[in-house]
Amino acid sequence: TPAAQDGEDPITWFLRDIPPRSDYALTLANPAIYFGLKDYDYAIAPSDIDELSPSADPDAAGSHYQGAGGVPISSLFRKLFYSIYFQDSDIFFTRNTNSASRILYRRNVLERVRTLTPFLIFDEDPYVVSDQTNLYWILDAYTTSPWYPNAEPFDGRLNYLRNAAKVLVNAYTGQVTYYLADPNDPISNAYRRIYPGLFQPLSAMKPELRRHLRYPRDLFEVQMRIYARYHQTEPDRFFNQEDTWQFAQTYRGDQAAEITPYYVTLNLLDPARYEFLLLAPMSPKGLDTLRGLVVAGCDEGRYGRISTFYFPKGTQVYGPSQIHALIDQDTRISQEFTLWDQVGSAIERGRMLVFPTAGTILYIQPVYLKSTTRLKIPELKRIIVSQGDYVVMDTNLEAGFATLQERLQQHRNRLEGARQPAAIEQPEPVNGAAPERPRGKPAGTGLEGGAAAGPNQ
């Protein structure tokens, strides 16, 4: 897959070129994006000026906006109004508009939904999906309250949080649709009665879009910060806070940083089925070792199901910060980093990922090389893989994993050899005579063949 490309290879694109084309069976009938994540200024479309044409034919006519988003500005009064509103006289004096022209504004999707529904809180991580025709932004909306009875406040601001709605924003037209994700949430039900028609049932979302829904990362992070204390169900242990957790720690540069939850595809819950999961590695509070993994299901059928995998408390499992230290002190990796980290270039280590696999923990970290000039285009150079005390760096994941397994097998062979007692060679017979039996102890005492046993020998 493109996600498993080799180091030093050029980046592999899922979609590329204009018009977009794909080597991975991705199709998109309308690739235009008028609403996105940046702080876009207003836009007037369609107009008498051609827009960028998505056609591969260089002689093809330019394209024009054909959506229903925005506000028509065919009259002088509206042009004057928006010219004053945006403090831009070009809106009033331009001669490039026509009777079909519309002004598009609030084109940042977060600003758009916050303006429409200021009583909802939104996830900071909108993501784009496709139904093979248009592009859509999906956002998670929350209802909150600081007044929920008998609930501990979080961060001093709220003690009630529900992922009440999934919000869909059409990237072409800007149309916003709210789908009720939690029908049992009393706050969203109250808003539904206040604003009839605001929320649609989740079943009304297109199936090809509903398959892209995922468990919200911000919600899961809040849940894990609370669960870090309340996973202790024994009263004495909870009272003494003997097993309080925190997010596993790593380093970014010289600064310690948490490994917050991230999305992965694993067969962790069912060995016969790969699933899209949200994973959080957890460590004991104040320690660098790994204590457990918590995963939330994102696929249909397991959506929202949270599972915890504990490591035995007496077993030491290296945490990400300890693996970071092993990487730093590996002489072969250090030599490579020193060679690359010369004038004009800099090494940047990517996010360290924790993967449970085959009954053990595997760490993976990409290594990028980037320019120190103004224009920085990071290039994937190497992949670091680690298991136990061993760290390996190679150009791709498969080669690195194979080398790592070889070193682990060599380590196991050395341990097996150390456990076996050294055999004492028997003297060769002279002229066909039988070897002489060792003297000092009769046969049957456990010292046959000259093998020494006993604390004084």
Feature names for model-found ranges:
Residues 1-457:
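Soluble extracytoplasmic regions of secretory-pathway and membrane proteins
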